[in-house]
Swiss-Prot record:
GO biological process: L-tryptophan biosynthetic process
InterPro entries referenced in this protein's UniProt entry, alphabetically: Aldolase_TIM, Indole-3-glycerol_P_synth, Indole-3-glycerol_P_synth_dom, Indole-3-GlycerolPSynthase_CS, RibuloseP-bd_barrel
Pathway as given in its UniProt record: Amino-acid biosynthesis; L-tryptophan biosynthesis; L-tryptophan from chorismate: step 4/5
Name of the protein this chain belongs to: Indole-3-glycerol phosphate synthase
Length: 268
């Protein structure tokens, strides 16, 4: 497990504990459970991801801690529509406020303007956050192994399945993958190619960890996919699912950037 103290991830997790305490004061778990009843049905994130090749989770992200504001002209509704028209399988929507300038309401806004399922991209630390994600109209949650204990991973993934949410479990190395594989096979596996300490990107991380998986297990490669050659490299190693944000957000037309990178995905 990567030690996250003195890293940006460590700072984010510290802030998330403060945020959780604040949110619990404003709305307790029972209130959030009531709120869930108003949410529309889930759209089937994993099913949609598997239905296309390449299966692309296209990210709606205004800023990042390392790059600052990536997209000043930020319109989640318009971006969601463009992604759907380009052939994305799913959306990833940042809800973290302090580090990524996201917003909770962006999930519902994006979903209202397209038919794609959405991942709540945030740093979740408690089952409360999972139930909250369902209330916010997410179809899938992200669990980052580097900032969660085995008990948290187990408890939060079970909570997600109870609320019909899909789960994307993110790992950075072999040790984290070993922990992730203890969870239900229903979980999707994501490999983040970015080193949390140096922020360097190495696409070989995905290739290396893919070899340790059963060939039938779907793997999502995350971070650093920037050229058609990167996509081809992954596909040559039987990796057909991608999470891409920055490459799209930096361009005036995210849909055109999508097509330049992936072409037109096909139904499988």
């Amino acid at each position: 497990m990567i030690q996250i103290q003195n890293t940006i991830l460590g700072k984010i997790v510290d802030r998330k504990h403060e945020e959780l305490a604040d949110r619990l004061k404003q709305r307790n778990l029972k209130d959030v459970e009531q709120w869930v009843k108003e949410a529309p049905p889930v759209r089937g994130f994993a099913q949609s991801l598997r239905s296309k090749r390449p299966g692309v989770i296209a990210e709606i992200k205004k800023a990042s801690p390392s790059k600052g504001v990536i997209r000043a002209d930020f319109n989640p509704a318009e971006i969601a529509q463009q992604y759907e028209q380009a052939g994305a399988a799913c959306l990833s929507v940042l809800t973290d406020v302090d580090f990524f300038q996201g917003a909770d309401e962006n999930i519902a806004i994006a979903r209202q303007h397209c038919s794609l399922p959405a991942l709540r991209k945030d740093f979740l630390i408690d089952p409360y956050n999972v139930v909250e994600a369902r209330a916010l109209q997410a179809d899938c949650i992200l669990l980052i192994v580097a900032c969660l204990s085995d008990q948290q991973l187990e408890e939060m993934s079970k909570t997600a399945f109870e609320y019909d949410l899909d789960v994307l479990v993110e790992v950075h190395d072999e040790q984290e993958l070993e922990r992730a594989l203890k969870l239900s096979e229903q979980c999707l596996l994501g490999v983040n190619n970015r080193n949390l300490k140096t922020f360097d990107v190495d696409l070989n991380t995905s290739l290396r960890l893919k070899k340790l998986l059963d060939p039938s297990r779907l793997l999502v490669t995350e971070s650093g996919i920037a050229t058609p050659q990167d996509v081809q490299l992954m596909q040559e190693h039987d990796i057909h699912s991608f999470l891409v944000g920055e490459s799209f957000m930096k361009q005036p037309r995210p849909d055109q950037a999508f097509t330049e990178l992936f072409g037109v995905p096909k139904l499988v």
